[in-house]
Amino acid sequence: MKSSAEIRNAFLEFFEHRGHTVVPSSPLVPANDPTLLFTNAGMVPFKDVFLGKEQRGYTRACSSQRCVRAGGKHNDLDNVGYTARHHTFFEMLGNFSFGDYFKREAIEYAWEFLTRTIGLPAERLWVTVYEEDDEAADIWLNEIGVDPERFGRIGAADNFWSMGDTGPCGPCSEIFYDHGPEVPGGPPGSPEEDGDRYVEIWNLVFMQYDRDAEGRLAPLPMPCVDTGMGLERLAAVVQGVHSNFEIDLFRRLIGAAAALAGLPEDSDNASLKVIADHIRACAFLITDGVVPANDGRGYVLRRIIRRAVRHGYKLGIDEPFFHRLVQPLADEMGGAFPELPERQALVERLLLQEEQRFRETLEQGLKLLEEDLRQLTGAEIPGETVFKLADTYGFPVDLTADIARERDLTLDMAGFEACMAAQRERARAHSQFKVQHGEGEQFEGESHFIGYDQLEGHGEVLALFRDGRSVQTLSAGEEGMVILDQTPFYAESGGQVGDQGVLETAGGEVFEVRDTLKQGEGHGHLGRLREGRIHVGDRLRAQVDAETRWATALNHSATHLLHAALRGVLGTHVQQKGSLVAPDRLRFDFAHYEAPSTEQLEQIERIVNDEIRANRAADIEHMAYDDAIETGAMALFGEKYGDQVRVLRFGEFSIELCGGTHVERTGDIGLCKLISEGGVAGGVRRIEAVTGDRAVMWVQRTEQRLVQVAETVKASPDNAAVRVAQLVDRLKGQEKELERLKQKLASQAGSDLAGQAVDIGGVKVVAARVDADNKALRDTVDQLRNKLGTAVIVLGAVAGDKVRLVAGVSKDCTDRIKAGDLVRQVAEQVGGKGGGRPDFAQAGGEQPEHLETALASVESLVRDALGLE
């Protein structure tokens, strides 16, 4: 009996020996693909290759790709633990051809691997093809020799695959394993196909078409093959078990979880299966850079962790346990995926922290649920309960649904959505929080800012606000504002964004600070309480996020250098009109009467970086406002200053009044790169820039693009601009030559079409489709009118999914037939409209499939216009 590792290795070796490049598994977070939460299929890393956007050094590949299906369109989370084959995490074995081999080889490889390498009996395999795919059917039946009794044709719902609504697509061929008549279920395509007897183990996708927006299929110039076979399913077949949870990959994990729960190692418990599945997904998600969060990928991870923890609680495990399953997982899969043991300590630490946080509210939430269930008169859990569990106790909705399912209950999702809508309404009110927090309730006290010299401190809660109103307590899940008597958090002002970080009670309750705002003389920490409660009078530890503060400081100091450089190059009339100083960039608006030249911008950037390399110290003084102005410090017009001000000086180069946070020396900035310049209003320009590591990355990306362009035009980076100019000149020449050839073709087309003219009542009529652009169509109409004399001409062309129509009528006919009327009647038949002069008119349409019929109607329309039968 082969182990899962042996099956994986056998698959990769089989295809490697047949010219395939073995490609390591990509991370679960797709690179440069915002449309996907996670890598959910083996073809995802090759998506751009299939779309023709990326070239690789091979045309055949194979992989064992780790995948997650939880959240988003593909979500198996709710089914895990209740079926034999659903998983949040699984491995997809796949072989791929990018314009190399096609159906015959793909089918032969699949059959050979299953029947010879793995040794599955042919009489146990059942094959399906797309109902219209005669080519694949012929290969299976007449070349492979599959028994027609174990072969079927299936419709598009199951056996036609597409990457999206448009783009590459094609028929599938699926291979099923028959567990035998003792297992209930029927063959694919039968009414009993959902039974467990026939299990799909391999799907071969033949991408041979390109579907356009109208649903039309055109042959792909480079047909491709994309196959996928779940390792866990194949292992179940090979190891002679009916459930994926009985294979070796899961036995060790289920045994370890059972030991933690004090259960026998061979327990057949759904909760053990859930835990074993979820540790795989969670460990590999963290390995690939996902961390628990309240949105996006991080929230999906949090949901999976909390579902596993709840099942552990259900088994009676009364202490953090989930992280202890990482070691047996690494023992089982670390050989195939070495990145897991490399990051094992991080995975264990994050899982432990997340479980500890959730356990603090898990028991309370379950108690609330039990109380509500005791009062329940029907079979539906109220939406208010579902919402409270999610909002206050951190229960993801699917976790509550899981509990309901175990008790044959359902959720009132309409009621839940109503609660969510009300919360969103409150959130919209919070969006005005920055401008005016609480209409009528303002903080009257004062916060002492201690954050110039330290990023951590302690402060007493002076006030709490929720929904704009002063409250005495904030509870878990609630949004609000916390004001301390002293804080290291910088509050948004002077263009610098407010700090982020956390406030923490002595008991470990965490308030996540997403922004810090001025509230009168106080610093308001705006955010959400993760768990527990905070009361007025509590003493909290305040911790600023050091990374974002430092990145913001780089940009703020660079803003001062930029301001001085602008005044030095463009003139002292330059005044700051606004700014944004954030961790990822700086934006500076300034008064200037024209766009700076390229040379001026280069000079400004050079001066700023000269000052950075000079490594000047940031000297900070507090002095009287008048004294500061007398020393040459710049004050911003419209800004309010007190009697005492803070002056920031970088040598003699820059002296400004500023209350923001900054670097200690200009050299800390590293590099400043201007990335855009433009106008935002009359007499106001805007520059955006990046600093530090982000500036380096921006330069590197730009260099990469230059190298790519140079390679494309076959030149060195130094000569790329000259080469591009040469190519543009050549292109212009070719466009002129193309125009000449179009004229020649139009003349030829006119001669050819003239011979097709039909005489209707003394009028020569031509209606034809001509593949040409608008100008060529017009020229051809003119050619035909000159050749035919008394004539009516209607020409049509298709460009993509659009129709072009041009009509011409000789002047001696325009009293009986108007070109505008005629082309309008034809255009209506192709879903369009148009018009023009009596002797010449144009139109367009949206239904190219009706063009031939529309053109065929021209003769009848001319007869009607001439009054002929």
Curated annotation (Swiss-Prot):
It catalyses: tRNA(Ala) + L-alanine + ATP = L-alanyl-tRNA(Ala) + AMP + diphosphate. GO terms for biological process: alanyl-tRNA aminoacylation; negative regulation of DNA-templated transcription. GO terms for molecular function: alanine-tRNA ligase activity; aminoacyl-tRNA deacylase activity; ATP binding; tRNA binding; zinc ion binding. Disulfide bonds: none annotated. Its main location: cytoplasm. Zn(2+) binds at residues 556, 560, 658, 662. One of its GO terms (cellular component) is cytosol. Its cofactor is Zn(2+). Keywords: Aminoacyl-tRNA synthetase, ATP-binding, Cytoplasm, Ligase, Metal-binding, Nucleotide-binding, Protein biosynthesis, RNA-binding, tRNA-binding, Zinc. It is found in: Cytoplasm. The keyword Membrane does not apply. Pfam families: DHHA1, tRNA-synt_2c, tRNA_SAD. CDD domains: AlaRS_core. Binds 1 zinc ion per subunit. InterPro entries: aa-tRNA-synth_II/BPL/LPL, Ala-tRNA-lgiase_IIc, Ala-tRNA-ligase_IIc_anticod-bd, Ala-tRNA-synth_IIc_core, Ala-tRNA-synth_IIc_N, Ala-tRNA_ligase, Ala_tRNA_ligase_euk/bac, DHHA1_dom. Its EC number is 6.1.1.7. Belongs to the class-II aminoacyl-tRNA synthetase family. HAMAP family: Ala_tRNA_synth_B (MF_00036_B). Consists of three domains; the N-terminal catalytic domain, the editing domain and the C-terminal C-Ala domain. The editing domain removes incorrectly charged amino acids, while the C-Ala domain, along with tRNA(Ala), serves as a bridge to cooperatively bring together the editing and aminoacylation centers thus stimulating deacylation of misacylated tRNAs. Catalyzes the attachment of alanine to tRNA(Ala) in a two-step reaction: alanine is first activated by ATP to form Ala-AMP and then transferred to the acceptor end of tRNA(Ala). Also edits incorrectly charged Ser-tRNA(Ala) and Gly-tRNA(Ala) via its editing domain. This is Alanine--tRNA ligase. The lineage of its organism: Bacteria, Pseudomonadati, Pseudomonadota, Gammaproteobacteria, Chromatiales.
